[in-house]
Amino acid sequence: IALGGHSGAGFAFDNGGPQHRVLLEPFAVSNRLVTNREWDEFVADGGYQTASLWLSDGWTWVKGCDVVSPLYWRRDDHFTLQGWQVRHPDAPVTHISYFEADAFATWAGFRLPTEFEWDTIARGQASETAAHDPEAGNQLDRAAPCQPTGGSGLFGDCWQFTRSGYLPYPRFKPADGAVGEYYGKFMSGQFVLKGASCATVRGHSRASYRNFFYPHQRWQFTGLRLAKDL
């Protein structure tokens, strides 16, 4: 049994609560993010041409939008300091959609973690405050340090897709005013992301924060780590 949701210490949006109990079966989550090098292997192995790897809607999206690589990837012999940058093979892959993350996980023989599995790894035996990476937030030139529980890049590198739909927690009640209008009406057809990116403000870099994208969206430093059942 694990606790999901915001603990009540400090500011949180209403979609992060209330805190509740979640039953988790034995699982393992990778202690690092998937890299550009690994994604290159996926591409070279025909990942974007193999329908069996993709969800049905994902395959329709790939074919309909001519998707052959993560957003912003291109092959070019020339670049400038102000323009295109060479991809570092060992840097986390970013700007991918949920469809792509799920297809890669299937190809690799794993799956995406649930948001509550991710939370459990991020919090470890510590409180949410202790799990918060003090270096996170706008760290465009450096990677986040490893967490005490062994997870590398949990906070501050990229938003990480989970397989959990963006839905209300038990006993959730939308807040009054604009905040409730925003979060409550978007709880349909989207997936939860965790971890915060290099462009995320410090206050949003915490274990309980729930970002959410539609499965085809890949614009804000989105990446993944792998999980499996034990």
Residue ranges of model-derived segments:
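Acyl/amide activation-and-transfer machinery of modular secondary-metabolite enzymes
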Residues: H20-L23
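Short proline/glycine-enriched turn/loop segments at secondary-structure junctions
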Residues: E181-G184, N211-R218
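Acidic-aromatic/histidine active-site loop/patch
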Residues: T35
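Short, structured beta-strand segments at or near domain termini in extracellular proteins/domains
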Residues: R218-L230
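Functional-site microenvironments in short loops/helix caps that host divalent-cation chemistry
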Residues: I1-G17, R32, Y48-R206
